[in-house]
From Swiss-Prot:
Lineage: Eukaryota, Metazoa, Chordata, Craniata, Vertebrata
Essential cofactor(s): heme b
Key word Coiled coil present: no
Homology family: Belongs to the cytochrome b family.
Superkingdom classification of source: Eukaryota
Organism of this sequence: Indostomus paradoxus (Armoured stickleback)
Protein's name according to its UniProt entry: Cytochrome b
Gene this chain is encoded by: mt-cyb
């Protein structure tokens, strides 16, 4: 008699997408980040749900309610620290997942890649509106500066900003709607994750060689499920250690002050995971140009599949392209550093050069090197 997991209508879906899923034998630890992102999403939704039970989305009470959660709610400090630092780990896994996709040519699964970009945008929006909720100084001014960038759009910009704010400045209406967005968008992201899965399982996973592995696959369970469990351990251990021993490592000291519209912080900056995009925004002196560059820094990923010129899918045997991609990684790290620094020389020039290099590598150098490597193969 067939097993229940193979015959039950619901369990069969779970079985086909996890337990008996045909998986390439040679996938490395770089393929662990998908499951780690799933873990991060579940952890963020659960901790966020408990925080929402005690949080008050009102400008007069938001700051105090966060302090109340940390001081008076049973294990509230731990839930809050896990949620705040969980976002950092979430983005770290996201960027490594994207980097793996770029290195091994996973972007050629266009459906999977495009739903992944949509997920990235949704999670970025969620993180941004979530950063505003504690109503600290950097929360308030970060929200004011970033949302006011929409005013750069011709004709509709000012109306759009006022519509988003719910008034003429970041105020109570803004905080209330940002809380609603922060609560709701992760559930939309969960639905998009299902789409991401759907597209991925339509084509099957890529592997380090970039070659078809249809003739050489094994079930996901037990081999890779145990490997994923080890990944969970290796993620949860440093996250818990950070939340317990150094919870404010990635936070901003200004957020220990209640939001004050009358006092501007000396240096306004977002969380570390947005700094590379913030540096690209600041590299353009023109406001509208900066906004377009900010959008392009993320949306440029959508054109990567169309710029693939190499006969080989993976970079595993393409040393020149490897060097180019590692240069891109270093460029992103430089942009992250520049984004967190004050806007002054020579840092401004370094940021502009790094921004130019970022787009040049993705749009020109990688496709050119693919063509050159094709010629070398001939």
């Amino acid at each position: 008699m067939a097993s229940l997991r193979k015959t039950h209508p619901l369990l069969k879906i779970v079985n086909d997408n996890s337990i008996d899923l045909p998986t390439p034998q040679n996938i490395s630890a770089w393929w662990n980040f998908g499951s780690l992102l799933g873990l991060c999403l579940v952890a963020q939704i659960l901790t966020g749900l408990f925080l929402a039970m005690h949080y008050t989305p009102d400008i007069n009470a938001a700051f105090s309610s966060v302090a109340h959660i940390c001081r008076d709610v049973n294990h509230g400090w731990l839930i809050r620290n896990l949620h705040a630092n969980g976002a950092s780990f979430f983005f770290l896994c996201l960027y490594l997942h994207i980097g793996r996709g770029l290195y091994y040519g996973s972007y050629l699964n266009k459906g999977t890649w495009n739903t992944g970009i949509l997920l990235l945008l949704l999670i970025m929006v969620t993180a941004f509106v979530g950063y505003v909720l504690p109503w600290g100084q950097m929360s308030f001014w970060g929200a004011t500066v970033i949302t006011s960038l929409l005013s750069a759009l011709p004709y509709v910009g000012t109306d759009l900003v006022q519509w988003l704010w719910g008034g003429f400045s970041v105020d109570n209406a803004t905080l209330t709607r940002f809380f609603a967005f922060h609560f709701f968008i992760p559930f939309i992201a969960t639905a998009v994750v299902a789409l991401h899965f759907l597209f991925l399982h339509e084509t099957g996973s890529n592997n380090p060689t970039g070659l078809s592995s249809s003739a050489d696959k094994v079930p996901l369970h037990p081999y890779f499920l145990y490997k994923d469990l080890l990944g969970f351990l290796l993620l949860l251990a440093p996250l818990t250690a950070l939340a317990v021993f150094s919870p404010n490592l990635f936070g901003d000291p200004d957020n220990f002050l209640r939001a004050n519209p009358m006092v501007t912080p000396t240096h306004i900056k977002p969380e570390w995971y947005f700094l590379f995009a913030y540096a690209i925004l600041r590299a353009i002196p023109n406001k509208l140009g900066g906004v377009l560059a900010l959008l392009a820094s993320i949306l440029v990923l959508a054109v990567v599949p169309f710029l693939h010129t190499s006969k080989q899918r993976s970079l595993a045997l393409r040393p020149w392209s490897q060097l180019c991609l590692f240069t891109l990684v270093v460029t992103v790290l430089i942009l992250t550093w520049i984004g967190g620094m004050p806007l002054e020389q020579p840092l401004t020039t370094v940021g502009q050069i790094a921004s130019l290099l970022y787009f040049t590598i993705i749009l020109f150098l990688m496709p050119m090197l693919g063509l050159i490597e094709n010629k070398m193969l001939n």
